[in-house]
Regions:
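The AdoMet/dcAdoMet-binding core of the Class I SAM-like
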Residues: 2-27, 74-224, 229, 243-245, ...
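N-terminal auxiliary segments of SAM/dcSAM-dependent transferases
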Residues: 2-64
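Short, isolated positions in well-ordered beta-strands
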Residues: 54, 73-74
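Residue-level signature for short turns and capping positions that connect secondary-structure elements
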Residues: 61, 71-73
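Short, solvent-exposed coil/turn elements at secondary-structure transition points
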Residues: 62, 160, 239-241
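A general beta-strand register signal
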Residues: 67-68
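Conserved S-adenosyl-L-methionine
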Residues: 230-241
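C-terminal lobe and adjacent flexible extensions of AdoMet/dcAdoMet transferase-like proteins
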Residues: 253-255
Length: 255
């Protein structure tokens, strides 16, 4: 139900009921609590060709926001906190930024940040072009038409299949902006050798790994994966108001 449809002064949509934790442990609400977003309008609501439920909601507190499969991905009001911390986490370990690979990140925020940081060439591997299209339409402040920039090359489809064709030691930076559930941890673990192969010596890999406050075991798994594969790992965090928690980014240097 939308706020504008009733006389009551406040109404909420996108109820995340986490009382049954076993079934809803992939959504970031504290155990036993309900999380609400005030919705002014629903701008998009459809299932993409690759099977993702995509929604663009205009939130009262956070502006236009992307939801995929009923989970908030990005809100225009505080997206810059996420993307800037993400990219700077890798740059802290090594400032080299000739080229980068982005795995996922369909909203375009990480791509925009790489452009703003002065990367010369960016290969953006994204599964679902409809996510990119709908974000360019409604969340233009986030991506800032990144796909139209000369420094960006978009590669559509399964990223891990695509990188099999990439030459060794290509990228200074790899940013893994996938979902933060167990499936994506397993997917990254399965393909970590391929990611390491295309990363330059002394290049850095950074992944968004979720919230250490909400899912400490999940973050630990990411850190262990990076440490096992690269011999080192570091962790950065930033509070994201629309997520209602701190968010973490794990990085490793390819020594």
């Amino acid at each position: 139900m939308l706020k504008k449809e009733i006389k009551h002064t406040r109404i909420v949509k996108k109820e995340f009921n986490r009382d049954t934790v076993d079934y809803y442990d992939d959504i970031y609400s504290s155990q036993g609590l309900k999380k609400y977003y005030m919705v002014k309008n629903i701008l998009e609501d459809f299932t993409s060709k690759v099977g993702q439920h995509i929604q663009i909601l205009d939130l009262e507190q956070f502006g236009k926001a992307l939801f995929i499969d009923n989970e908030l991905q990005v809100a225009e009001k505080d997206e810059h906190l996420y993307s800037s911390t993400f990219v700077n986490s890798g740059l802290k370990l090594n400032p080299e930024k000739n080229n980068s690979a982005i795995i996922g990140g369909g909203d375009g925020g990480v791509a925009r940040e790489c452009i703003n940081q002065g990367f010369n060439y960016i290969d953006w591997y994204e599964l679902d072009p409809q996510v990119v299209d709908v974000c360019e339409k409604h969340l233009s402040k986030v991506g800032q038409k990144a796909t139209k920039k000369n420094s960006i090359k978009c590669v559509w489809g399964d990223a891990f299949e695509s990188i099999k064709k990439v030459e060794d030691n290509k990228y200074d930076k790899i940013f893994v902006d996938l979902n933060d559930d167990q499936y994506c941890i397993d997917l990254a673990a399965k393909n970590i050798k391929s990611l390491k192969r295309i990363l330059k010596p002394n290049g850095t890999i950074t992944a968004q790994v979720g919230s250490q406050d909400k899912k400490p075991k999940q973050v630990e798994k990411w850190l262990n994966l990076f440490k096992k594969s690269f011999g080192n790992s570091s962790l950065d965090r930033i509070y994201i108001p629309s997520f209602d928690c701190s968010w973490n980014f794990a990085s490793s240097l390819n020594k």
